[in-house]
């Protein structure tokens, strides 16, 4: 039933008038789909589809509450992750090609590949931290406008996972964040809470 609703949103819905129900269903199902990348053959496709659904849900939420910065922060986070991945592979490949092209050293080992690997991991790690910071900002604001405080926890777990990804345990935190993300979306009420009060001016 939920999947049928998702298809009806994507095909028949008036995109100029998104609702919180759209955000709830698209975001929740999208987050769950992102978790099943391990399924043979089609898992990665389902995961990408889920990622796109979450993006659509957050764009809808930004539009509903007139909070474009939420979606902007998310896009910055995604861009940081992509840049980190690209830098990682470019530095690794460049180091290996340099090692292959350089003449052998008889008296001292060539440490260029090792240094390249270290730099690649550090660049990837830095990009992940930047991405985690912006995701945390986006989900923190989502918690404020929707009244679902679990979004704030989701953003924090994403940030922790991004920081710890360099030692692999961060991947577990990212999986937990995805689960919390799904629960957060499904916890959205169709009636929006009153907007948070602006900070006092002294």
List each language-model region with its residue ranges.
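Hydrophobic alpha-helical transmembrane segments
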Residues: 112-128, 166
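Membrane-interface extramembranous regions at the lipid-water interface
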Residues: 6-37, 43-85, 111, 127-163, ...
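General secondary-structure edge motif
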Residues: 38, 106, 119-122
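Membrane-interface interhelical connector segments
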Residues: 99-112
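Membrane-helix interface motif
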Residues: 89-102
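Glycine/serine-rich loop-strand microenvironments at binding/catalytic pocket rims
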Residues: 35-39, 92, 115
